[in-house]
């Protein structure tokens, strides 16, 4: 039985670990070949979040190859349009086309109110989480159009792209901006049968969330909070009785939006949020 994206090629940013790796593996499980990029070094000033590494990206490569799918992987900063374009061009040449784009790369740092956020933190956040998304799509669109078969673009936003939380205003601004990109690209690219949607996760069990800084942000009342301490507060964000979801939960949404099952779905901000938006 053919996979749900059998024979397609997907370009995924932030693919070394976390949600990006999960997306690469899930799409490969369903028959896609992968173009994967990740910066593989620290960008955020938040030292509580361990940086992705070349070894992480190499592990993603091996996982995809283990599914008998092809993968082209490079270390690329999504703020560097020329580098993005080069790897997409090369990947398309090697793999034979492009059908799916998952603009997933992102960073997180928080703790300060907006008026006390440093310019460096603001610039990094907007550069990666908003401008990087735009540059990713910009690099990929010519291949989707020239392929003549339409395509699916999925942008990773957040529930923070639909509502606000304190102490992460630069993140909130970037993720709201992603929704604007999604809607505009959907309007502009629809004539080419290219669909554009966004996914809006709540807390996800990845290093971006499961780190000392986030735990202290959730539990400032404790000196050394752990995951169980954070879960007590995190669960209060949701209607369903969980503190966070797993990367594969987001990947299943990405797979649906990438597949022909969603052939007439475009301009949709899809939440995977355990009911967070109902709170």
Swiss-Prot record:
InterPro entries per UniProt: NAD(P)-bd_dom_sf, SDR_fam, SDR_subfam_1
Binding site residues for NAD(+): 11-33
Pfam families, sorted: adh_short_C2
Transmembrane segments: none
Entry EC no(s): 1.1.1.-
CDD domains: SDR_c (cd05233)
Keywords recorded for this protein, A-Z: Isopeptide bond, NAD, Oxidoreductase, Ubl conjugation
Protein residues bound to substrate: 158
Active site: 171
Cysteine-cysteine disulfides: none
Crosslink position(s): Isoglutamyl lysine isopeptide (Lys-Gln) (interchain with Q-Cter in protein Pup): 65
Enzyme class: oxidoreductase
Single annotated GO MF: oxidoreductase activity, acting on the CH-OH group of donors, NAD or NADP as acceptor
The family this protein is said to belong to: Belongs to the short-chain dehydrogenases/reductases (SDR) family.
Name of the molecule in the record: Putative short-chain type dehydrogenase/reductase MSMEG_6031/MSMEI_5872
